[in-house]
C-alpha cells in the first residue's frame, strides 16, 4: 500500500533508516504489529510501512511500547517457570485461549487435520504446564449475538436526523485503533459497541471461569493465541469492568507463529488432548467455526438475523459479489424488487480508506460493513501468514482457506451453553450486567483532518 500524500510533518518515522526496520523475534515493533505490511510507501525521504503511520508515536505511549515488547514467549515461560519454582500458594493458573483462525495454520504447518491439530496443540501446551486450553468460538458467539441485536436496533432507529447506519464491525483491533486515533468521532459513532471475541473471552475466563474455580482474577494468567499482532495491542487496552475486579482480560497474546516456534523447539511426541470447555470436566471434541470465509463471520450471521427479524425472510446461503476487488464484496437482500439490506466486507486499508472517503461524502449505500485491517481477512494475519522475509505467504493462505472452509459451521443461536451463560453468568439476555460485560465505548483522539487525504 502506498501513501504518497501524507502531510504528517511530526511523524517520527521520517528519520527512520532501513536498518531500524528490522526487529527481533522477542520484541516485535509496533510497526510490524499493525495492519498490512505490504509494500513500502514514502513519507518525505524515509521508507516506512503504512502500519508505521497507524502505530506512530502519536498513537502509542512510551508505556504502551514497553508493555507491547513484553507480549512474547519469554513472558509466557516466565510464568511457567515460576510455577515450577515457587511455593504452590503463589502459583498461577495458566489458561490459553485459541482463536479458531489459528487452527488452520497449525493444521497446515504440521500436516494434520484441523481436529488433530487442535488436540496436538492442546496436548503440547499442557505438557509445558498449561492447566486449561479453551477455544474462543464461544466468545465470538456472544460478540455476534450482541452485534445482531444492535444492528436491528440501529436499522429501526436510522433516519436523516439520527444517522445510525452504516454499522461498522469492531472485532478487528487494528481497524478500531485506526478509527479512534485517526478518524475520530464521525466514524467511531458507527462502530458496533459489542466487544470483540478476545475481550469477551477475557471476561469469561477472568470472571465466570474464575468464580467457577474459586479463584481471584489475579491468580489466572490468561494467554490468547491469535493470527495477528494487533491482538497484543488490544490486550493492553482492554480491562474488565470495575464490577469484575478491573484486571486485564488477557495477560499475554502470542501469535500462531510464535507458538509454532515453541512447538518446533519442544517435544511433539507428547500425548494429544481434547480442548477444555468452561463447563466442568466437559471436553470439546469437535472443532467448529462461524460462517465467514476467513473471519469470525459477523457479516453472514448478522445478515441472516436482520433478514428474518426485519423482513421475515429466511436466508440459508449468503451470496457474496465482488465489487472493486476480492477484498471488497457485497451482500444484498431484495424484497419486491427493492434492495432492503446492503452489506459489505471491506478488508485491507486500501478498501477501508475508500469506504471512509465515500462515507464522509454521503455516497456510501451500505447498511453494514465487516471491516478487517488485513487484506484477505483474519487468516492472513501477519502473525501466521508470512514468509521468513516478511511478505505474505500466498500459498500458505490458500491452504489455510481450504482447511478453514472444511470446518463445520455453527450458528451462535444454536449454542445451549451460550444461552445457559446468559442466564447463569449475565443475569439475563438484556440485563444491565450483560450490557456492562459485553459492550464497550470508544475514545476519539483525532490528530488532524489531513489523515483522510492519505491515498492508499
Curated annotation (Swiss-Prot):
Keywords: Nucleus, Phosphoprotein. Its main location: nucleus. GO terms for cellular component: lamin filament; nuclear lamina; nuclear lumen; nucleolus; nucleoplasm. Pfam families: Fe_hyd_lg_C (PF02906), Fe_hyd_SSU (PF02256). Residues 1-19 have a biased composition (Basic and acidic residues). GO terms for molecular function: lamin binding. The modification Phosphoserine is found at residue 29. InterPro entries: Cytosolic_Fe-S_CAF, Fe_hydrogenase, Fe_hydrogenase_lsu_C, Fe_hydrogenase_ssu. This is Nuclear prelamin A recognition factor. The lineage of its organism: Eukaryota, Metazoa, Chordata, Craniata, Vertebrata.
